[in-house]
Amino acid sequence: MFEKVVVVDCRGHLLGRLAATLAKELLNGQRVVAVRTEEINISGSLFRNKLKFHAFLKKRMNTNPRRGPFHFRSPARILWRTIRGMIPHKTPRGAAALERLKAFEGVPPPYDKMKRMVIPQALRVLRLKPGRKFCVLGRLATEVGWRHSDLVTRLEEKRKTKSAAFYARKKTLVNLRAKAAVAVASKTANIQKELDHYGF
């Protein structure tokens, strides 16, 4: 997929598989925007993933913990860090690839009007065996210190309401256009035949 910018809707994708696909695309020169990162899924129960995250939180520099490693709590940064681990980010090529990535919780304004994609090979419903446990990244992030879950939920509700209203208007206009085309079909039959002849 090579386009100017690809917007990926992360809802229902498995974290590792999504990150691997995006890392490959970034290294190939594709610009990627990941939205709705709080809806990413991780295989394994919430309890198990919390234990793993708390083990990760213990990893720090003895003499000065402020020097790293840094433990990001927001879903967008967790995805960013996962992708960073799959890219040679200390080389100029890897650093340039990481610059091509943007990740957001929710769907912020410029991207709410753009076509969003999914990645089939990373979708949980296609990859995880039914009945297996999984958890949502937003919930995990909230339980380890992310404080903006409520705000993102509120903004997403507003966006979905506006989107539903826009879709209803669009559907009405499409129906009106279809009716108008049927109404004038008999009058424009000769013209349409001529246009068909020329491939329009």
Swiss-Prot record:
Gene Ontology terms: biological process: negative regulation of translation; translation
GO terms, molecular function: mRNA binding; structural constituent of ribosome
This protein's record includes keyword Ribonucleoprotein: yes
PANTHER family, sorted: LARGE RIBOSOMAL SUBUNIT PROTEIN UL13 (PTHR11545:SF3), RIBOSOMAL PROTEIN L13 (PTHR11545)
Disulfide bonds: none
InterPro entries the UniProt entry points to: Ribosomal_uL13 (IPR005822), Ribosomal_uL13_CS (IPR023563), Ribosomal_uL13_euk/arc (IPR005755), Ribosomal_uL13_sf (IPR036899)
Keywords linked to the UniProt accession: Ribonucleoprotein, Ribosomal protein
GO cellular component, one term: cytosolic large ribosomal subunit
Family affiliation: Belongs to the universal ribosomal protein uL13 family.
Protein name (record): Large ribosomal subunit protein uL13
Domain of life from the UniProt record: Eukaryota
